[in-house]
């Protein structure tokens, strides 16, 4: 008999070992910085402004503030009592400027309705209305230190010199066709400056109405202007985010103040001429050293554009803006106090 050998035992091939997993770096989750806390709700007061505060002026005696707003109203406030004295008047369109007359008993206010109105501070009674006629709205207004003349800048490009005693136009100076967005009067009352939304600056002789100089001062519009006490220098703020100090004797830029990240809309000089405050659409006001051009402090409203700035008699910085409030700020920077709140929305 044939003997068959047993079938061979099949050994399955050894499966290759799985490859080792690649080393994977463990990336920790990103650290997300917490959002800054939201600003506290704004206080309100029924008699406050109902829209942006676009102008502030401090009375010569330092006791009161006058404000102009796009809600058409002019309001007079008591600083010490922290309350409204009265709504001084209402324009037919946005109010733009409100200035105390040197006599201490009246004010001059102006707005987009084209009217310049002299009002009694004691009760708001209208003493005189200066109508700009076909010149359009009054964007900015300035008064000579002796109270004899007012200079108005208009949205149709003209600059008008008013004889306040006679209640009449002394000169109507033709600009360059662009809306006039800044005006200022020299301390001696003999010269005036106008700035336009194209960045052009013009120096005028008030008595004759003649143009003394014209130059392109900024790459964008000029929205704030102030003469220094010596009358030989001028500061201007602009939509190009800069502030410039001009030497009027040479016509050259003497210094530049930089730091804002939006249009510089308002300027004011301290009584001693050592400090400059600027308000900007970037939501900040900044305090500057006039001698060095260095920034001393920054005030951040966190509530939108700042349209108006002023110094009180003791040097406190005041601002007004998009949030309808009037605020005062510590000189070294930091948080503000709402001096006068806006009306409830």
Regions found by a protein language model. Give the residues of each.
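Intrinsically disordered, low-complexity, repeat-rich polar/charged segments
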Residues: 1-32
